[in-house]
Amino acid sequence: MAEGEITTFTALTEKFNLPPGNYKKPKLLYCSNGGHFLRILPDGTVDGTRDRSDQHIQLQLSAESVGEVYIKSTETGQYLAMDTSGLLYGSQTPSEECLFLERLEENHYNTYTSKKHAEKNWFVGLKKNGSCKRGPRTHYGQKAILFLPLPV
């Protein structure tokens, strides 16, 4: 390819017969580490479950600005948040602890970094057993921080 040329590819939705993306619809965040779906329970606990029928895994992602998202449970109405010690929890109201930087990685998974703690590179992560991984224990390259947004 010569410098300045643009190459276009056919839409993947045609090749794989996928529905066009609708970001208004709830998503499931599937974690590469252990095969868990991110879940926000009514008591504010955040963990992972392999039960795809669990209503608490349906999450609404909404953009605050380019690359910045809020992640809200459609069932409980709580927002995913990360406190000052790096613990994930469900918050009733959106705050700066609820804002995450969403990044599409080369392997097509997404990562979510706490915007408030961006200088520390604290990611949303799940351990193999489905429990939350604290922000300070996460780092780039771990499977625990890789999430695949799936349709409900």
From Swiss-Prot:
GO biological process, one term: regulation of endothelial tube morphogenesis
Pfam families: FGF
Keyword check for Repeat: no
Gene Ontology CC, one term: extracellular space
Sites where the protein binds heparin: 33
Localization: Secreted; Cytoplasm; Cytoplasm, Cell cortex; Cytoplasm, Cytosol
Chain positions listed as propeptide in the UniProt record: 2-15
Main location: secreted
Keyword annotations: Acetylation, Angiogenesis, Cytoplasm, Developmental protein, Differentiation, Growth factor, Heparin-binding, Mitogen, Nucleus, Phosphoprotein, Secreted
Record has Cytoplasm as a keyword: yes
Modified residues (N-acetylalanine): 2
PTM annotation: In the nucleus, phosphorylated by PKC/PRKCD.
Lineage: superkingdom: Eukaryota
Positions of the UniProt region annotated as Heparin-binding: 127-143
MF terms (GO), sorted A to Z: fibroblast growth factor receptor binding; growth factor activity; heparin binding; integrin binding; S100 protein binding
The protein's assembly and partners: Monomer. Homodimer. Interacts with FGFR1, FGFR2, FGFR3 and FGFR4. Affinity between fibroblast growth factors (FGFs) and their receptors is increased by heparan sulfate glycosaminoglycans that function as coreceptors. Found in a complex with FGFBP1, FGF1 and FGF2. Interacts with FGFBP1. Part of a Cu(2+)-dependent multiprotein aggregate containing FGF1, S100A13 and SYT1. Interacts with SYT1. Interacts with S100A13. Interacts with LRRC59. Interacts with CSNKA, CSNKB and FIBP. While binding with LRRC59, CSNKA and FIBP seem mutually exclusive, CSNKB and FIBP may cooperatively interact with FGF1.
Homology family: Belongs to the heparin-binding growth factors family.
Function recorded in the entry: Plays an important role in the regulation of cell survival, cell division, angiogenesis, cell differentiation and cell migration. Functions as a potent mitogen in vitro. Acts as a ligand for FGFR1 and integrins. Binds to FGFR1 in the presence of heparin leading to FGFR1 dimerization and activation via sequential autophosphorylation on tyrosine residues which act as docking sites for interacting proteins, leading to the activation of several signaling cascades. Binds to integrin ITGAV:ITGB3.
Stated name of the protein: Fibroblast growth factor 1
Organism: Sus scrofa
Name of the coding gene: FGF1
